[in-house]
Structures are given as C-alpha cells and as structure tokens.
Amino acid sequence: MKKFLALVLSLCLVLSLAACGGKPADDDTAEGSKTGGTIQVGLNSAPVSMNIWCQNDLNSATIMNLVCPNLVTIDDDGNKYDYLTESSESNEDCTVWTIKLKELYWNDGTPVTSADLLFTAKYGVEHHIGFFDSYYGLVDFEKSSCPDERTVEFALTSGNVNFWKGAGNWIPVMRESEWSSVEEPTTYSYSGAGYGPYYVSEWVDGEYVTLKRNPYFTQANDGAGACIDEVVFRVYTDENAMVLALQNGEVDVCANFLSASSISQLQSNSNYQIESVGSLGYTLLTFSQSNELLQDVNVRKALAASCDREALVNVAMSGAATPMYTPISPVYSDFTASNIRQPEFDTAAAASILENAGYVDTNGDGIRESADGKPLSFTITYKGTMANVDGIMSILSSDFAKAGVELKLQPVDAATFSANVTQGHKYDISYSSWGTIDDVDTTLLTIFGIGQTLNFMEFNSQEQEDLLNAMQSETDYNKRVELLNQWQSWFVENLPCCHLFVPNNTYAADTTNFTGWHLSPGNSAFLACANFVNVHAK
C-alpha cells in the first residue's frame, strides 16, 4: 500500500526561516481560546490524489481546498469574491488584470509570493495541465510581471471580463520552488505543503488522509488561523457506510451530499445539522465522439429524447432536484429567459428519429442496427457511489430500450472514472455531475472548447469555438446574453451532451462535539475553506 508522509516542520527549519518568513498565528485571541481538537470527516469514495492541478476529482478537491485554497471563493448568495487576494482590478477592456495577494505563508513559514502565482499560470499553460489553458491561456507572459512581492499584473492577448473570477476560483497556487524542476506534472506526487489553514501530514490511499493545522495561516479569526488542530478524512465504500459512520460517532461530518433515504435516517436526531443548498452544477450524459455511432446527431437527438427528467427527479431523486430542460442551468434566470430547450422526452419520437435515419432492428432482438450492421449498444460509465445512481440508471436504460437502444451499465470507482473518462477519453456514454458551472456567460469555453480538459467527449466545433470566444471578450452584458442564446440554439441542434437535472444538495454534520458549521454554495459544502476555519470544539 502506498503511504505518503508529507512535510513536517522541524525545529531547525523554523529557526532558519524566522527572520525572513512568517510567524505562527497568535492563539491568544478570543477565537484562539477555541483552538484544538480533531474532526473526523467521512468520504463516500477514495480521493484520487493530492495533485489537484492535474485531475478533476471532487473528493480530492474537497480535501485540498483546505491545503491550497482557491484565491477566489463563493459567498452565501452564490457570488464570487476575493478571498485570499486583497484586490483584483482590470483596465477598461479587460486586457490587463492586477491581482494583489493577501499575506500568505506555506506551512514552513515561507511567504507565498507574486512570483509563485505568475509561475503557476505559466507552468500550467506550458505543460497543458488541467484547466490552465482555459483560464490562463490568454495570458501574454512576456508582457506580464510582478511589480512587488504580492502583486501580479497579467497582460492578456484579448479581453476576458471574468478572467480572475475563473482563474482565481479554480486554480490554486503552485509553489515555484517545488514545481519548477518537475518535468512531468501529471505523474508527480505532490508534497502536501499548504498555504491554507492546513497541510497534508499523511495520505494513505483508499483509507484516510490526515491534515495538520498550518501555524502560519492568519487569514481567519482575527489572525488566529483555523480553530481545529487536525482534520482526518476517512474513506468509506459508499454513502450507506459513510452515513452509518456518522450515526455511530466515527465521523463528525459527511463531505458528500446525501440521498433522500439517508436524510430520512438522520433527521429525527436533533444533534445533526442538516442543511440543503441548490447546486451550481448539474447532472449530464456525455457522448464520446470516439464512438462512430455517437458522431451521428440523429443518434444523439434520439438519446436525448429518451431522457425522462420528470421521472429522474421525482422517482430516482425523490423530488430532491430540479429538471433541466435548457442547456443552461435554471439557477441562472437571465440566461434561460429565452427558454431554448433540449429535446422533450418522447421515446416514440426517438424511435422515429432513428428509423428515419436508417437504424432498424433486423434480427428482432430489440436493438437497432446501423446500415452496416453495428448495433446501437452503448456502455454507460459512471461513479458507482453517486447518490441515487441505481435508480437513475434503471430509468435511463428502460427508456433507451423503448427507442431500440441498449444501455450497458458500468459503475466504477472515482479513479477508474478519471482514468477512462475525464483523462483517458475511452468510453461510450458517461453519466456524471458537475459540482459547479459558474460565470456561464464566459466560461463555457472550459467545457466545450476545442482541446479543453473538460471536453472529454472530444466534440470539437469551430462554430461553437467562435461563439464561446466572442462571449469571453464581450464587455457588454446584454450582448453576451445574445451570444449565449446563439450558443444555446447551436447546442440543441448538435447536442454534444445532454443535461438532465440540478440536484438540491443536502449535507449533514454532527453538532455533539463541534459547532460553527456553515453551508455555502459550491463543491465543498461544510468543508469550504472560508467557512470551515470557524468550526470549533464546544
């Protein structure tokens, strides 16, 4: 078993850095009196790795958001704000952005500098890591600079009205002294160093992750830093095991949102703080363009018309979701006012689309074939630990069959999903859930752009690319909405994927030993860095 021991502060290192680095947070404050204790956190599946720059696993991101937090975060109303940056300003056409960092220190007392931030952007783009091309791809590094130790001036090749809202919210800072010598970032085992309230002390794959308090983090509780000394993330096989651990007192909080059946088991106990928040993301099916049959828009339209959103929401999700008929989430009312809709549920219409396109069942097995005899039989890959996923798959496979399409179920763990779908692009159809899709009038390029990391279906369209690029640089809001409507019309005609519903995410925390739990929109729920630093022992 792989076992990782992260950086540990030694006395000699602390002494050597005392003169030029930060000093430990002062515990002699009102909040400082609340410091101490260990919180146990339940995870419904194993995190992939602490190298969150190179993969897109939610549980890994939840852990590492306490270690290397994003510099921009989301408030209770779903609005983004500068969290670990003092300010972010642009010129009139949004081609120059000036970002000023707050005083941040790695857990050995070394300052986080503007050079680290500029290095992060350049290194990620040069190595084509994850989201870097999406958020920093417009940066002209020859013209960008660091005027002082905490200020970066990013010069862009064209305007982007939400440049920092995107980059700051999605890409944590990389430590230049650690990463500059790394030639292959995707296989690199990160040290676990943190500039947030914690650093990784121990990471045991498939079992647990232990975080220790960063004594140099002062951006909470009037300079005192985080209240809790240690956070242990424990891995369980599925949601049921995680919830049982909460009931047995093995964990204090569940990191993942819970199904309606799990909530019903907990809600009678007044010790549990149970809160819901509307997701900023949504569930979806993606159609891999590596499969020749799925390259046919008629097949994609038929599959989309076989998705019964009402049944998915009311039966599989027990009402804890909102159907998503438009390409954009209904959370964003301005952007869905045009009511441009995906195909309505109608399996007879789906069958007719396929029949007219030449897909017929020639051998009576219930599965249609193409003109050259290839059956419309697809494997759907999904994380087996997703909430209510068995019911969702039952509804989808039954309705697809009515149109003459076979859906073969392939539940996998998070690491396999990442390897086969988001990283490997070796699949037919995937079912997954975006945690957060934000700034949709400018950041859809990160999902659908040619060669973008999240475009793992490899649906590459220059017409779409031009629309998405135009949205990014348009400074007039109303004109961006017009462009977005053009894109939505393009989407429903081409269907690179099919959007299903927006979950109403419900989370649970035990208040027996700890208090201060607070829920905001976003991926990390009770564990969101800006909120979790205030959780303390009773």
Please provide the spans of the model-predicted regions.
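Ligand-site clamp/hinge motif
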Residues: 186, 216-264, 406-408, 413-414
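N-terminal lobe/hinge region of extracytoplasmic solute-binding protein
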Residues: 42-92, 122, 193
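Aromatic- and charge-enriched surface segment that lines or borders ligand/interaction sites
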Residues: 86-130, 153, 293-295
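Append "and occasionally in soluble cytosolic enzymes with long acidic Gly/Pro-rich linkers
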Residues: 212-213, 295-398, 486, 536-537
